[in-house]
């Protein structure tokens, strides 16, 4: 009877150990690799609080969180771009970028490409500055919730007319 309990305990250890290996997202191992590379496990990293986590905790509404997340993802893309030629962390960076693509962009390549295009614009480029100022009024109109509500009401009104005719 004693041997049976040892065998069962051993099997449980094997099962739990294998679950830890196979259930873990691939980015976790690569993030740990980056932590080692950047010495991000050192105690002084916690000085002066967190960069992103407190901000994310402050925002509960999905739309607000998406805004904050987009800025954070933009930061990581810029960080990864600075180290794109470092072969020691290349695999880790690519794995994490791919996981961001799945989680944040829902594997939508067009959405990711447009996002990267936006993050790559240089604010010191005079042509970019001129175009941005030229488009400012239209961009501000798109940001306004009133403009979106007006569009929605008009489209509902037209749908209602078509249905009644």
From Swiss-Prot:
GO terms for cellular component: extracellular space. Released primarily from activated T lymphocytes. Keywords: Antiviral defense, Cytokine, Glycoprotein, Growth regulation, Pyrrolidone carboxylic acid, Secreted, Signal. It is found in: Secreted. One of its GO terms (molecular function) is cytokine activity. It holds the Pfam family IFN-gamma. GO terms for biological process: adaptive immune response; astrocyte activation; cell surface receptor signaling pathway via STAT; defense response to virus; extrinsic apoptotic signaling pathway; Fc-gamma receptor signaling pathway involved in phagocytosis; humoral immune response; macrophage activation involved in immune response. Homodimer. Interacts with IFNGR1 (via extracellular domain); this interaction promotes IFNGR1 dimerization. Belongs to the type II (or gamma) interferon family. This is Interferon gamma. It comes from Macaca fascicularis. The lineage of its organism: Eukaryota, Metazoa, Chordata, Craniata, Vertebrata.
């Amino acid at each position: 009877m004693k041997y049976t309990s040892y065998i069962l305990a051993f099997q449980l250890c094997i099962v739990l150990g294998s679950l830890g290996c196979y259930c873990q997202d691939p980015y976790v191992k690569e993030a740990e690799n980056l932590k080692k590379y950047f010495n991000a496990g050192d105690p002084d990293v916690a000085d002066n609080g967190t960069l992103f986590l407190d901000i994310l905790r402050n925002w509960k509404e999905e739309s607000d969180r998406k805004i904050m997340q987009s800025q954070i993802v933009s930061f990581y893309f810029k960080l990864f771009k600075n180290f794109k030629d470092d072969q020691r962390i290349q695999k880790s960076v690519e794995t994490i970028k791919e996981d961001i693509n799945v989680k944040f962009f829902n594997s939508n390549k067009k959405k990711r490409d447009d996002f990267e295009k936006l993050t790559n614009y240089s604010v010191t480029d005079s042509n970019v500055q001129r175009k941005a100022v030229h488009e400012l009024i239209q961009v501000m109109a798109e940001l306004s919730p009133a403009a979106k509500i007006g569009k929605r009401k008009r489209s509902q009104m037209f749908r209602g007319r078509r249905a009644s005719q």
